[in-house]
Amino acid sequence: MSAILSADDLNDFISPGVACIKPVETLPKNESSNSQNPYEVTTEDKVQPENLPPAQISLTDCLACSGCVTSAEAVLISLQSHAEVLNTLDAYPELPLTQNHNGPYTGSSDALDGESRIFVASVSPQVRASLAATYGISEKEATYMIDQFLSGPHGLRAGGKHGSGFSWVVDTNVMRDAILVLTADEVSETLKEPSARAISKDTLPKRPVLSSACPGWICYAEKTHPFVLPHLSRLKSPQALTGTFLKTVLSKALGVPPSRVWHLAIMPCFDKKLEASREELTDVSWSPLDGGVPLTESNKPVRDVDCVITTRELLTLASSRGISLPTLPLKSLAPSYTPHFPDETLNAFLFRKQNGSEQSMEAGTSGGYLHHVLKTFQAKNPGSEIVTQRGRNADVVEYSLMSPGGEPLMKAARYYGFRNIQNLVRKLKPARVSRLPGARVPAASAGGNRRQPISRNSASAGSGTDYAYVEVMACPGGCTNGGGQIRIEDAREASTSTQSVTAVENPSKPTPHEQRAWLARVDEAYFSAESDAEAKWTVRHSPSPSLRGRLGSMKLSSIGLT
C-alpha cells in the first residue's frame, strides 16, 4: 500500500461518539415556583416551558450533519433492519386486492379507508447468487426460495399479527436493463460537440462520466473529493428506479397514495441503506406524476425505498420468524399467491419468462454498465475491436475501442475498491499551482511576461480525463463481494447440506485462499443466472412504444425511462 494512502482513507465510517458534534440545545431545569424569590430577576435563558417534548434526531439529520457520521452503518442498521420489516408487517395489515373483469386489481373501499399497506419487494441478482452459493442450489432455485419466503404460505404469511406478506417481488435486473441503455445514451451525448447535443449542458455530467450506482463510492466522493461530483452520472440506481416505478404505477393503477405502498429492497451491501435515506430519492422528483391521487397522508416525504436489508439480514429475518429457508419449496408460487400486475404490458415487462442463456463474464459482477457502453459503441462502429489492458490488479481494467485501422475511438475503465479509487481520483484532480521557491515555470504567455509556476502534479493530473466512462464500485471484486453478503463463516452455520460449501468444512477461521474460493463460488452462481435474451426487449435503444402508451401521462424522464 502506498505511503500516501493511510488506513483511515480506506474506511469512511466513523463510529458515532458519546457527544454529537451538533447537539440539541437544552435549557437549564426550571426551579420550583415555591422556592423562587418574588423579587428575583430571572434571565430569559433560564426560563423553560413545562412538559417539553423529548428532542429527536432522525437519520436524515445525522446524514445532513456530516460531522460524526459518514457512512453511518451503526445508525442505518438500527433504523433499517429485519426488525423494521417485522414491525411494519405487524403494524399494518396487507391491502386485499380484488380483480376487476378487465384485469387490473383494485383495493376494497373498506381497506382503502384503513391503515393497510401494499407490500412490494425488489431483490438484486447478487443476493440470489449469495443464497445459491450458500445452500448449493441454482440461481433460479434461489429465486424460488426468496419468493416462497416473502409471498408464500410457508413464509412470512404463516406468522405475524396480520399474516401479511409481499404481493409482488421484483428483480432489479429489469430496471437495470433500462438504465444500461440510458447510460450509453448519456455517455454518447457527452462525446458530441456542444452544438449537436440533444440534452442541455447543465443536465449532462462532465467527461469522464463516472458511474453513480454505488452509494459507498458516492458517499466517499461527497465527503472527501467534491471536485469529482460534476462527473457523476445523473441516473438513478436500479434500486431507486425500481422504487419510483412501483410506487408511481401502483399508486395510479390502484388509486392509493404512494405512502401506502411499502417497498423493501434486499441488497448486497449496507451502503444501500444510506442511498435509500437520501432526500433526493423521494417523491419530490416524481410527485407531479399522480394527478388527482393524494400523494401522502401526511407532510412526510415518500421515499423510493422504505427499508433496505442485506443478504445476511434476510437470513436473520427468516430466523426471527422461525423459518428455515432450505426447507421452503424450491418451486414457483401458486397463482393464488402471485397476482398479476395491474397492467398486462407491465406484468410482462416486470415478470418476464427466462430462458437458459448465461450472463457474460465480461460484463462483471456489478451490473455491466461499462460492458454495455462498450458494446453499444462497438455496434455503432462496425469492424471495431475492444482491447483490454489490465492494471496493477484485477480490479483495475482499461478498455480501448479500436477502429479497423488501429485508431482509438474511445477509452473506458473499471475501478473497484477504495485503494484503486484513490488512484482514479488522483488522475482527475485538477492541477495545483506550486508555490515552492525554485519551481519550474512555463514560457511567457501571449498575454504578457508573467511567469507562472508549474505544479509537480500537472503531468499526471487530469490524465484520467481521456476516459469516456468509468465504472466505479467501492467493493473489491464488485457487488458480489458486498459487505452485506453471506460470508463463508455464515454459510457454514446456515447451510444444511454437506455439499453446499465445498472445501470449507474446517470450522477454523477461513484463510485468504478459502475466502477467494468462496467469492469465486458466488461469482459462478451470479454468472450462471438465467437471463432473458428477449428481455433486452427493445432496451437496446429506447423503451418500447407500448410501454410508453401504457404509462399514459406519466413523464418517463422523471423516473429515468427516457
Swiss-Prot record:
Gene name per UniProt: nar1
Free-text function comment from the UniProt entry: Component of the cytosolic Fe/S protein assembly machinery. Required for maturation of extramitochondrial Fe/S proteins. May play a role in the transfer of pre-assembled Fe/S clusters to target apoproteins.
Protein name: Cytosolic Fe-S cluster assembly factor nar1
A Pfam entry, by short name: Fe_hyd_lg_C
Coiled coil segments of this chain: none
Residues where [4Fe-4S] cluster 2 binds: 214, 269, 475, 479
Organism: Aspergillus flavus (strain ATCC 200026 / FGSC A1120 / IAM 13836 / NRRL 3357 / JCM 12722 / SRRC 167)
Record-listed [4Fe-4S] cluster 1 binding positions: 20, 62, 65, 68
Gene3D superfamilies xrefs: Fe-only Hydrogenase (Larger Subunit), Chain L, domain 3
